């Protein structure tokens, strides 16, 4: 494609934006929330938006897609940004709004677990509302990552064996294959404040790092969020 419109600025959206932009494609990203990567630390999304724009990617945040129309010049995506109508046309449109768990049809009629309409409800042991039936992975977890599902499986079996789980499902490492790459683990600064945890933040730039200099990204940094009293 010579032009691509990506609806959704989460992990999948920005990874494809980076990939197609590097191939010379004209890329536009439309995100409904106030920044890219809304599920990660605010600074990551804000800095990534600047980097993508520097790479030629157009980014529209706080923008809601209204409709997509087929025309002679391609597909036109109509959207509103803070109430103002706008549109962008591309040869193709990628829907990166997210994925829905596919659990329907797994249970017999009359034997349905409690759900919120999307995910299956489980307790702290991974057990559903049906005694003896457990659920792990995308069907029950808000974090749709393969290593999270694997960790949930390990924890579930350990609990069934009356052992204390050896994994921490609240400390999930993750990465984003954009340029430069992003990696994170643990609570964000906003998460800590939302839980009334006193936090202190340390940050250093990586401008002198060899990888940063060779790649020429120019905005690499490391950020550590720790408990203000214990430093952990």
Regions found by a protein language model. Give the residues of each.
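FAD-site-proximal beta/loop scaffold in flavoenzymes
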Residues: 1-2, 87-160
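Rossmann-like dinucleotide-binding cores of NAD(P)H-dependent redox enzymes
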Residues: 1-5, 11-85, 142-150, 158-191
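Conserved N-terminal phosphate-binding loop of PLP-dependent enzymes in the Aspartate aminotransferase
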Residues: 56, 121, 224-226
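Short, conserved active-site loop motifs that form the nucleotide-linked donor/cofactor pocket
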Residues: 57-58, 133, 199
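Solvent-exposed alpha-helices and their adjacent loops that cap or buttress functional pockets
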Residues: 69, 85-86, 127-128, 132, ...
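Short gly/ser/thr-rich secondary-structure transition/capping motifs
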Residues: 74-80, 113-121, 207
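C-terminal catalytic lobe of FAD-dependent flavoproteins
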Residues: 87-114, 130, 184-232
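Glycine-rich phosphate/pyrophosphate-binding beta-alpha loops
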Residues: 138-145, 178, 207-212
